[in-house]
Swiss-Prot record:
One annotated Gene Ontology cellular component of this protein: cytoplasm
Keywords: Ribonucleoprotein, Ribosomal protein, RNA-binding, rRNA-binding
Claim: rRNA-binding is one of the keywords in the record: yes
Protein name: Small ribosomal subunit protein uS19
Function: Protein S19 forms a complex with S13 that binds strongly to the 16S ribosomal RNA.
InterPro entries in UniProt: Ribosomal_uS19, Ribosomal_uS19_bac-type, Ribosomal_uS19_CS, Ribosomal_uS19_SF
GO annotation (BP), single: translation
Domain of life of the organism encoding this protein: Bacteria
GO molecular function per UniProt: rRNA binding; structural constituent of ribosome
Length: 92
């Protein structure tokens, strides 16, 4: 279910402060974040965030198409190795 319109998008407060600090400094560093639940805002476009996936920070470069989505959508938490090979075919 989508978030109610009257509430507006959710963004952790520290995230806005970090992004503004990097923009003011003019540096192009990776901003490490743990808030996968935060919505990507228009002022984040052009910045690179390191989104934590449970074991490491995945670099996510934000572009215009990502605005309105959540950071967690771009940093997968599970690794898929495929289904097990057919053991009968392997023996022959």
């Amino acid at each position: 279910m989508a978030r109610s319109v009257w509430k507006g998008p959710f963004v952790d407060g520290y995230l806005l402060k970090k992004a503004e600090k990097v923009r003011e400094g003019g540096r192009s560093e990776v901003i490490k974040i743990w808030s996968r639940r935060s919505t990507i805002m228009p002022q984040f476009v052009g910045l690179t965030f390191g989104v934590y996936n449970g074991s490491k920070h995945i670099p996510v470069s934000v572009n215009e198409d990502m605005v309105g989505h959540k950071f967690g959508e771009f940093a997968p938490t599970r690794t898929y190795y495929g289904h097990g090979a057919d053991k009968k075919a392997k023996r022959k």
